Swiss-Prot record:
Bias (Basic and acidic residues) ranges: 34-51, 107-119
Organism (species): Chironomus pallidivittatus (Midge)
Main location: secreted
Name of the molecule in the record: Balbiani ring protein 1
Record's keyword terms, sorted: Repeat, Secreted
Bias-annotated ranges (Low complexity): 1-33, 93-102
Gene transcribed to yield this protein: BR1
């Protein structure tokens, strides 16, 4: 056969390399599901309104609505504050980053709330009304320790006896102290009771007899501590039996805070010794005593006078005990 004979044409029909092949750009199984439709301005607005109704958070760049309770991983968690006032739900959502109208935590790892100027002003005023100290940097109000004027002088501590008063309290306590006749120490804020000298106002007379002089000298009762004498009979004899009263004892017992009792000085009684008279005359049980054992103004007491004398003593002691125990 001739070499020039017809050959199969190279340009004949062959399987086309450019024939139909699976398109690389054709539909493939989507790993993440159907993509959201790109948003235009109208779509954003519609989606934002839907999101607002569900109280979610709308992302304009992703055209997505995130539930308020479930923030996306890429977004910082924003919890609604409990103390700062919430902004209204009807605020329009814009694609621009939101400026907080409330004090909200900027992230979970940061405790300091972030405030805008309006919020700082509002929170600052609230804090001032509460008497606190406002920190504009972290938008927090720290309660200031409230220093109330004392209504009483209180001890500064359990182990400290000194009282701490302000000037107003010192004036008040000083006035109270003056009214009760005390002496006020402004340094310690304490009132010390001044010894009260109650001078005798009247010299009462008891019944007199021809044998026993019973003129009553003035009362030696002065300050409260003077009322509670160890020997009730000291007062008893001063009350009822001037002429049998030992004037030295009178001076000693009437020495209340320097008070002077002329009756004690003027007594012309014998130096008989009050306690001797007491031992002979007075018995708490009201027992008898021997006739003639006691002389008053040089006279011996008769049985009748003796009985009256004993009864008067007992009645007087009872009255004095009632006074001293009241």
């Amino acid at each position: 056969p001739s070499k020039s004979g017809p050959r199969p044409s190279k340009s004949g029909p062959r399987p086309s390399k450019s024939g139909p092949r699976p398109s690389k750009s054709g539909p493939r199984p989507s790993k993440s599901g159907p993509r959201p439709e790109k948003c235009g301005s109208a779509m954003r607005k519609a989606e934002a309104e839907k999101c607002a109704k569900r109280k979610g958070r709308f992302s304009a760049s992703k055209c997505r609505c995130t539930s308020a309770g479930k923030p996306s991983k890429s977004e910082p968690r924003t919890e609604r504050p409990t103390t700062c006032v919430e902004s209204s739900e009807s605020d329009e959502v814009t694609p621009t980053p939101e400026v907080p109208t409330t004090c909200v935590d900027s992230s979970e790892s940061r405790e300091s709330p972030v405030c805008d100027d309006a919020m700082r002003k509002s929170e600052g005023e609230k804090c001032a009304n509460l008497g606190g100290k406002f920190n504009a940097e972290n938008c927090k109000c720290t309660p200031e320790p409230v220093t109330e004027g004392p209504t009483t002088c209180v001890e500064s501590s359990e182990g400290d006896d000194s009282l701490v008063c302000d000037d107003e309290m010192r004036r008040s306590e000083a006035e109270k102290c003056t009214k009760i006749g005390g002496k006020f120490d402004s340094e310690t804020c304490k009132c010390t009771s001044e010894p009260v000298t109650e001078g005798p106002t009247t010299c009462l007379e008891s019944s007199e007899s021809d044998e026993v002089t019973t003129k009553k000298p003035c009362d030696c009762t002065c300050a409260p501590e003077c009322k509670r004498r160890k020997m009730i009979i000291d007062v008893l004899l001063k009350y009822f039996y001037r002429d049998v009263y030992d004037k030295n004892c009178c001076k000693e017992n009437c020495k209340c805070d320097g008070a002077k009792f002329p009756e004690c000085e003027e007594s012309n009684s014998k130096q008989s010794g009050m306690f001797d008279i007491l031992a002979k005359l007075f018995k708490p049980q009201g027992g008898d005593f021997e006739a003639g054992s006691v002389e008053v103004d040089g006279k011996k007491l008769t049985s009748e006078k003796k009985e009256k004398f004993g009864k008067a003593l007992q009645d007087a002691v009872k009255g004095l005990e009632d006074v001293l125990n009241s």
